[in-house]
């Protein structure tokens, strides 16, 4: 089998990885089934409007997975379990599977890792996460990523596989912590966008990041994650990035909520998947079961349900009972 890679999902992140990793492989197969993606691929322009390298090939059918021993899934989280079910008939003992999808499986209402183990109980999956805007990765801007798996060989394999001169990889055994960070930061980015839309300043943004990190850590700890994970790349690093720049669709969505007061119009204006909105209900459901307080995430939920205005949410957060800074 040649040194090939299959990336499932030709959106922004899948396209970025195919562009950034082209020199590591003989051929990169980019799997898609939508006519819009096929048209872009035929014109050699990615979802990021950046030309694909010569060795990135469109794959119409999943049988092409047989030509690659390494697979990276980059579909939105709501499609993750469906993709796993579709690829299962094509997977053999030589394949190694990772995913760059962030969020929870909202279809099965569980971690992506749990969905993976449900369908592939005898395999060790791997998540690729960290502060990484797709557009900057495609432009070869220096970026650091976390590669997490409970299996040391699996995480080391993918860490070496995707490292380049501009992609630096770090390994982590705490796959649950990495997935919690990648999910919760999207909700907090919506909150940051709301604050930006309300014309609040850097003080507010800093407070949101710091207190949001506390919410993320509390939830992760209740699920067995390590606190150290949340002060690393997949926690604090990704949170700062996603809350600070409008390359984040979640942040733009928060701004649009303030400007439009309408979820449907906000989503149209953002023009892409808003993972924070998709996973919000599930995250809060888990938090309630674990009796974990997540006031910022809760206020984002109330806003998206039309129960309160953004300004009312801020007033509530500012008037909560006083707490110690380490809580």
Curated annotation (Swiss-Prot):
The keyword Nucleotide-binding applies. One of its GO terms (biological process) is phospholipid biosynthetic process. One of its GO terms (cellular component) is cytosol. Its EC number is 1.1.1.94. The active site is at residue 185. Keywords: Cytoplasm, Lipid biosynthesis, Lipid metabolism, NAD, NADP, Nucleotide-binding, Oxidoreductase, Phospholipid biosynthesis, Phospholipid metabolism. Gene3D superfamilies: N-(1-d-carboxylethyl)-l-norvaline Dehydrogenase, domain 2, NAD(P)-binding Rossmann-like Domain. NADPH binds at residues 13, 33, 102, 134, 249, 275. It comes from the Bacteria. It catalyses: sn-glycerol 3-phosphate + NAD(+) = dihydroxyacetone phosphate + NADH + H(+); sn-glycerol 3-phosphate + NADP(+) = dihydroxyacetone phosphate + NADPH + H(+). It is an enzyme of class 1 (oxidoreductase). Sn-glycerol 3-phosphate binds at residues 102, 130, 132, 185, 238, 248-250. One of its GO terms (molecular function) is glycerol-3-phosphate dehydrogenase [NAD(P)+] activity. It is found in: Cytoplasm. The keyword NAD applies. Pathway: Membrane lipid metabolism; glycerophospholipid metabolism. HAMAP family: NAD_Glyc3P_dehydrog. Belongs to the NAD-dependent glycerol-3-phosphate dehydrogenase family. Catalyzes the reduction of the glycolytic intermediate dihydroxyacetone phosphate (DHAP) to sn-glycerol 3-phosphate (G3P), the key precursor for phospholipid synthesis. This is Glycerol-3-phosphate dehydrogenase [NAD(P)+]. It comes from Vesicomyosocius okutanii subsp. Calyptogena okutanii (strain HA).
